[in-house]
Amino acid sequence: MIHVTRKTQLPEEFTLKKIRFIAGDVFTTMGKPGDASVVFTNDDEVQLLNREYRGIDAPTDVLSFPSDEIDPETDIRYLGDVIISVDKASAQSELARHSLEDELTMLIVHGCLHLTGLDHGTPEEKSFMKEKQESMLKALHIKDYLWPEDH
């Protein structure tokens, strides 16, 4: 199950069902079924987490905290947490001239790809992750977005 926490306002059309579908689709496509959490919050909270876990005292658009624990009671894998700054997403959507919903979708896909083990630390990793992300966004009918450079 995809657990969703909304600590800030989201677009009305960005429903729990849609959020769960997007994240679940990433995990299914990548062959990594399991549970995860997606949290929508503000710049202040993301900045605190970014400082605490990455040593960067600034907000960012999305943070991913992979896990690979298996619940002993249910035998279901917990893939981790994706934390999204809606403030940052809103600013980026304006810059890219697309909807906040499209930006949030891109950030969910990007964050969930990290939970499946993908990264962009090397040029090869970045190329592979970008290819996967573009393919998934295309399937979701989203084509114009900026690649997140700062996370």
Residue ranges and their predicted role:
Residues 109, 113-117:
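Short active-site segment of divalent metal-dependent hydrolases/proteases
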Residues 1-102, 116-151:
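An acidic/histidine-cluster motif and surrounding catalytic segment
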